[in-house]
Structures are given as C-alpha cells and as structure tokens.
Regions:
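Activation of the activation-loop gatekeeper triad in protein kinase-fold domains
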Residues: 201-207
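ATP-binding glycine-rich phosphate-binding loop
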Residues: 1-41, 72-79, 86-88
Length: 353
C-alpha cells in the first residue's frame, strides 16, 4: 500500500515499464497518472530523493516546459507531481503524468527489419503507425531527423530554463541519463495532423545546480553506451549522450561500433577503448581506422548528410575539450537546415544494405 503526500491511498495498476532503479505502474484509479516506485537498494542510497522530487515538482509549476505542436502544447517530459510514501511514511517514489501510446526510442533506433521491428507490440493499436513512421528506410529516415530535431529543441529548453513569464531561471540542470530507453515518442493527431511527439522520462536522475546549492543523486544512473569519456559532470556530458542518440537514430549504428583499429590501435577493440582514443570513424584518426565490412554502409551514409551536420558530429565525438561539443541550439539549426533543404530526397538519401 502506498500513499500520496496528503495521505490519499494509491493502488497500483498494470506495470508500464521498468529500468535499473525503479518500476513504473499505472495509477489504478486514475489512468492519467503513473507511479514510479524505486527499488529498496536505490532508496537506501538516495537520501535526498524526496528533496529532489519536491524541487522538480516546484520547478514544473513555474517553468516553461511546454513545446507547441500545431495549436496544442505538450509538456516536454514526465515531471514529478507528488511524492509517494509507504505505510511507514518513507518516501519510495513519485507520481507523474502517464505518457500514452509512446514507444521507447530503443525500439525506434533498432527498427530496421519490418518483420521484426516493434514485434513485441504487434497487438498495440499503434503498431502499424510506428512501422509507418519509424522504420529505418525512406520516409522513416526523415522522421528520425525530425525526432532528433525535436529532441534538440527540448533539451535546449531544459538547459536554458525559463519561467512561464519568460524570465531566466538561474538553475543548471544536467545529467539526464540520456538514452533511448529514457525517451518515449508517440504519434499524436493534433487538429487533423499527425505529429511525432517525444517525452523525456526519468527526470528524477538529474542534477540541479543554482548559485548556492547543488542537488544531485548520490549515485547518478548512467549507461555505458551513452557515457562521455569524462563521466557525468555537466551539460557537456549530456551533449555527448545526445550526439550518440542522434547518430543512432540517423545511422542506425552506435558511432563507435563496427570500427576497426588498423595498425595504430590494434591493441583494443572495446568500444570504450575507441571512445577514449578518439576513434570516431570520421574524426582526426580516420586514416588509421576502418569500419567493419558488414556494417560499413551504415557509417558510410555519413557522407550523405550536410557538411554542417557532419561537423557537428565530428565536434561531438572528436573535440579536445567537452565544452567544444555542439550545443542543442547548434544541433537544432543544423537539423532544421537539412530538413528544410528541398534538394534533399530523404527517401533516396541512404544505402540500407
Ligand atoms: N510517465 C510514464 N508514462 C509511461 N511509461 C513510463 C513513464 N515513466 C516511465 N515509463 C516506462 O517505465 C520505464 C522505466 O522508467 P524510468 O523512469 O526510466 O525508470 P528507471 O529510473 O528505473 O530507469 C521507462 O523506460 C518507460 O518504458
Ligand atoms: Mg530509465
């Protein structure tokens, strides 16, 4: 049995998903709400969890966290709305809005084969629209650029948070544990048009820093594939994770996968080793590198995107300093320029085999 901050009982409905830290359920008597319940071992470590949830809840009341889609506005993530306590009064989780009809980006990133993509969700009413929108080919490719573009706008907003009245909020938020599983995308009909609408999840993991205080999880979650070489510190760490995600959405390949080390880097094939040694296939060491024959066409598609976007990827994965990685603002401009370039034929742009 669980309770809200003012003592109302919460009954858990069906499970919506789970991650490394928690399970998320539908609220049994209010399906518009989702309930995140942390695992005991996480609660033991996260002594300031209640404080962070409270702070995020307050922030959600005052900050402009909406994006326009057609004539509607969507909240850009699942923000904590209330804490959840167990019967002895310990904080064990929080309540947020349910994201309906969303698919996590891990499925979109890997959606290459129409016979297996989204198969787990074959009976979901959205199955065919996900196939239609996100399959890694022709039309799906353009939508993956669109998705990356929206995400760059979303995160730009997060890093330059403003109040609803437009005043800047003096607060840095970073270390989102950005990875496909922490982002959902749904196709929503808004006044007669279908829009791809992303949602950022797992917001409890982030760090909030103002001039006086820093509020962060005692053991921030991270995921190796999205972890920048320097580890989670600031927004530049997130810029790395986001660039990996954009690369995966666009090229259906992790930037450091299927890269071979040639002579100079022959002592390691681990992805981590390549990341640390600046072995991005299009970076400074490219003359020492090759890409695996099976997958080379995927990295090879890099040459088909605009040089503006190529440079953003190179800066993201091959800069000397984390602060040289492109900002979300630069990504959104680069992606929009490419999307608006009428001479780009997205359905014929890439090789898929
Ligand atoms: N508001 C929500 N609406 C719908 N599904 C959600 C929501 N929040 C989380 N989920 C699902 O639950 C999974 C785990 O949630 P998450 O907050 O990422 O937990 P963890 O901190 O353990 O990673 C997500 O990957 C997603 O599939
Ligand atoms: Mg998660």
């Amino acid at each position: 049995m669980y309770k809200t901050s003012n003592g109302q009982a919460i009954k858990l409905g069906k499970e919506l998903g789970k991650g490394g830290a928690a399970n998320v359920y539908l609220h049994a008597s209010d399906k518009s709400k989702a309930v995140k319940i942390f695992k005991p071992e996480i609660l033991q470590k996260e002594v300031n969890l209640a404080k962070r949830i409270e702070k995020l809840n307050q922030l959600a009341q005052i900050a402009d966290i909406e994006m326009p889609f057609g004539n509607a506005k969507k909240t850009i993530g699942a923000w904590p709305k209330d804490i959840v306590k167990d019967l002895s009064g310990n904080v064990v989780g929080y309540i947020m809005d349910t994201v309906n009809g969303g698919i996590d980006l891990a499925f979109i990133v890997g959606a290459r084969d129409p016979t297996t993509a989204f198969l787990k969700y074959r009976s979901d009413p959205n199955y065919s629209s996900w196939l239609n929108y996100f399959l890694y080919q022709g039309r799906g490719l353009k939508n993956r650029f669109v998705l990356s573009y929206y995400l760059s706008l979303y995160f730009d907003k997060m890093y330059k948070l403003k109040a609803k009245n437009g005043a800047r909020i003096e607060l840095d938020i970073c270390n989102f544990d950005i990875k496909p599983k922490n982002i959902l995308a749904s196709i929503e009909n808004i006044s007669g048009h279908n829009h791809i609408v992303p949602y950022i999840l797992d917001l409890d993991n982030l760090t909030l820093k103002d001039i006086k205080h820093k509020l962060s999880p005692s053991s921030a979650q991270f995921t190796q594939e999205y972890r920048a070489p320097e580890g989670p510190i600031d927004k530049y760490y997130d810029y790395w994770s986001l660039a990996v995600l954009f690369y995966q959405l666009i090229f259906n390949q992790h930037p450091f996968d299927a890269v071979l080390g040639g002579t100079r880097f022959s002592d390691g094939t681990e992805r981590d080793f390549f990341i640390k040694n600046k072995c991005f296939p299009w970076g400074r060491n490219r003359k020492f590198l090759s890409v695996g024959t099976q997958n080379d066409f995927r990295h090879g598609n890099f040459l088909k995107i605009s040089s503006e976007l190529q440079h953003l990827f190179i800066r993201a994965f091959d800069s000397d300093l984390p602060s040289q990685r492109p900002s979300m603002d630069e990504w959104s401009r680069g992606l929009l320029d490419f999307l608006q370039n009428n001479s780009v034929q997205f359905d014929r742009l890439f090789r898929y085999k």
